Amino acid sequence: MSKESNLSEYRPIRVALLGAGSVGSEVARLLLEQKSELAARVGAELELVGVAVRDLKTKRNGFPKELLTTDAESLILSADIVIEVMGGLQPAKDYILLALNSGSDVITANKALLATHGSELF
C-alpha cells in the first residue's frame, strides 16, 4: 500500500497558526497551497484550522476570512500542532504554555522568548 493511500485512514493533523504577519502569512500560504505535497512528506494531511490575530479589522491578503480569529485560546485547544509566529514575549509565552499543557506540539522561532523563558517552556 502506498503512503498516499494510507492518508485517508487517519484524521488530519490540526494546525493552529498564531500570528499573521510576514512569516505567518507565508506559513499559511504554504499550508493551504502545498497541502498534497506536505501530506505526502508527512504521511498525514495537515489541516490549517485557524489563524489567531489581534485585530480582525486589519486587512490581510491571502487568508480565507473564516480561518481568522481573535480567540487564540480556543484555537490552541483545538489543535494538534501550534505554530507561534507572533513574536515578543507575551502573549506568546502564555499561548505556548497552554499548547504544551494541552498536549499540542509547538513550533516557534521566537528567539527572544526562547532566550528568556526557554528553560521554563522546554
Where do the protein language model's features map onto the residues?
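N-terminal glycine-/serine-/threonine-rich beta1-alpha1-beta2 phosphate-ribose binding loop
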Residues: 2-104
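Rossmann-fold NAD(P)-binding glycine/threonine-rich loop
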Residues: 92-102, 111-122
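Short hydrophobic alpha-helical runs that function as membrane-insertion/retention elements
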Residues: 106-108
